[in-house]
Amino acid sequence: PAVAVQAAAPGSSGSAARAMTVVASSPPAAASTTPVPAGAPTAVEVALAQQGDPYRWAASGPDSFDCSGLIMFAYKAAGVSLPHSSRALRGMTERISVDELQPGDLVFGGSPVHHVGMYIGNGQMVHAPHSGDVVRVASVYSTSKPVSFGRL
């Protein structure tokens, strides 16, 4: 099934409002035997709604986030409790390939892992990049190398 989400940047209005629609459909016959969590569409919607919120180390919302704090906050809204650590998140996911990615899957960067974002479809993720930046959408390959992917 397709997931369609619209989110406007916080504090924006009128012609200055930034809105984004993401439509992602399931790829055919993924090799992973683990289904995407039932709360994934809600988590994607919540994460996208945080666009424009500032990055702050160790923050988990509601008005600022670090990378794992954004994931934790979004999945908490979907009824899923997760740790506030990109490495801990990596350790609890099933490794999947880029071809298996579904909205709600996690994108990890670094070796050892030190960054995480949430896949939203079409090769894009929503993430809280680093100090001085804001929650935003970017390519899954815009994070620290190497990049790996996981399913909760």
Protein language model features and the residues they cover:
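Intrinsically disordered, low-complexity
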Residues: 1-54, 143-152
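Catalytic cysteine-centered active-site loop
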Residues: 50-103
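Short glycine-rich loop/turn motifs that provide flexible caps or phosphate-binding loops at active sites
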Residues: 51, 57, 68, 116, ...
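Alpha-helix initiation/capping motif
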Residues: 32-36, 60-64, 139
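...with weaker cross-activation on analogous glycine-rich loops/strands in unrelated enzymes
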Residues: 80-134, 139
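Residue-level signature of the cytosolic catalytic core of signaling kinases
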Residues: 36-39, 63, 99, 109
